[in-house]
């Protein structure tokens, strides 16, 4: 066996699943952790925590595979993506579909350990993961669908932990959508010139010269929604200090994107990992101080 060939193939699969770029998994993980702690207002059961953490990473990997499969004929025309495994030929289309099926199967097996209500909701998660990659062909709002896909773990968490879908669940879901649209618009600003050339749609194109303003308004909406959740659930001062810190990070992101320079927009996007982590720390410390 040619071990170098085997290693190259394994590395290509890892790149297809974005194992080398964990930012997407982290941006999916933080809202899931927010929900896990808020749904029961306590440290979640280890089994439930494990299922959702593993589910985040397997479903994010599945989402990356189906996204690259959907974009396989587009990515070759974009500087940032032309070296990806599918457009470069390192991975075949059949292999990608089999890998997607395997990742979804593992994710569903994890969900089967939860209650029937959560299992039913998981079908929506699969539908969103499948539909999102194709939205950029038909609408300028694919980021909105991504927000729903990235946030669907929230109602699943609430049903798994409390078997209910209270108002706080849907407020958290909305907060995640506004946050996701904001940071994915920053991400789309990196590729805006290429997207305009090849006809791919995004909120960065839709918002045009108002992109920075709308991102700021979405970030403000995120903070307001999270503030309402804190008030409704009686979270303490530490939580609001975390929100103030998140507001400071959002202001820093606005400074980064002021000239719409590609690398700076990408740095602003990456900075959202700190936002998610800070909010989680605020929730955790607030609950521990009860």
Curated annotation (Swiss-Prot):
Enzyme Commission designation: 2.5.1.39
Localization (cell): Cell inner membrane
Q: Which UniProt keywords apply?
A: Cell inner membrane, Cell membrane, Magnesium, Membrane, Transferase, Transmembrane, Transmembrane helix, Ubiquinone biosynthesis
| Main location per the UniProt record | membrane
Q: Where are the transmembrane segments?
A: 38-58, 99-119, 141-161, 213-233, 238-258, 268-288
Sorted alphabetically, the Gene Ontology cellular component annotations on this record are: plasma membrane
What cofactor is needed? Mg(2+)
* Top enzyme category: transferase
Q: Which InterPro entries match?
A: HB_polyprenyltransferase-like, Prenyltransferase, UbiA_prenyltransferase, UbiA_prenylTrfase_CS, UbiA_sf
Look up the record and name the pathway of this protein: Cofactor biosynthesis; ubiquinone biosynthesis
- Any one GO biological process: ubiquinone biosynthetic process
Q: Which reaction does it catalyse?
A: all-trans-octaprenyl diphosphate + 4-hydroxybenzoate = 4-hydroxy-3-(all-trans-octaprenyl)benzoate + diphosphate
Q: Which GO terms describe its molecular function?
A: 4-hydroxybenzoate polyprenyltransferase activity
How does the UniProt record describe the way this protein sits in the membrane? Answer: Multi-pass membrane protein
Give the family per the record. Answer: Belongs to the UbiA prenyltransferase family.
Q: Which NCBIfam families match?
A: ubiA_proteo
Physiological role: Catalyzes the prenylation of para-hydroxybenzoate (PHB) with an all-trans polyprenyl group. Mediates the second step in the final reaction sequence of ubiquinone-8 (UQ-8) biosynthesis, which is the condensation of the polyisoprenoid side chain with PHB, generating the first membrane-bound Q intermediate 3-octaprenyl-4-hydroxybenzoate.
Which HAMAP family does this entry report, sorted A to Z? UbiA
Q: What is this protein called?
A: 4-hydroxybenzoate octaprenyltransferase
Gene field: ubiA
